[in-house]
A protein has these predicted regions:
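Boundary/linker segments flanking structured domains
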Residues: 1-47, 51-176
Length: 176
């Protein structure tokens, strides 16, 4: 069975901006993307993709043993919600698995789990929204995780070869 997820990411948060904004929203945010410099790293940017199944995602980031504490400085945080269906635990797990399995080849990912792709057809569509303006982010910094993550990620069975293939579309363009 095929699964389709539309993810709406809000971002370019700094940690101190996130909680107040999140409280003011009606949506439940289940996923997050973090980029920054790891302790003792001068230039290299590292990334972390995670899930939170709490009322407030920002509470998860405040956990004492969370990976956010591995960063000496945070470049950005994006928080995401699945907008085309009520996200159940298995949906959040599947989306996190797709994101980490794609991104592990792209950058310095701190995640140590979920590096293998799922065994079903999955379609992910990512929308990037500027949290202050509530409008689409048309330009992001080159090293932004929102710029590195494709807008569309498709993982599906190639029936001719009888194996799964990964398809991506980096940035969708508006047509006139």
């Amino acid at each position: 069975m095929e699964k389709v997820y539309i993810l709406r990411w809000y971002g370019l948060f700094q940690p101190e901006q996130l909680r107040e904004w999140e409280i003011s929203q009606k949506a439940t945010f289940n996923l997050y993307l973090i980029s920054g410099k790891k302790k003792y790293s001068k230039k290299k940017i590292h990334y972390y993709i995670g899930k939170a199944e709490r009322k407030l995602l920002s509470d998860r980031l405040n956990d004492r043993n969370h990976h956010i504490n591995d960063f000496s400085s945070i470049n950005e945080i994006w928080i995401g919600t699945i907008i085309n269906k009520k996200a159940m635990h298995r949906d959040v797990m599947l989306v996190e698995k797709m994101l980490t399995s794609y991104f592990v080849a792209e950058g310095e990912l701190l995640n140590s789990i979920n590096k293998s792709l799922p065994e079903k057809n999955i379609y992910l569509i990512n929308e990037w929204i500027h949290y202050k303006h509530n409008s689409e982010c048309l330009r992001l910094p080159k090293i932004s995780i929102g710029n590195m993550m494709p807008d569309v990620i498709i993982y599906k069975m190639d029936n001719c070869l009888n194996k799964y293939k990964l398809f991506v579309s980096n940035k969708l363009k508006v047509t006139e």
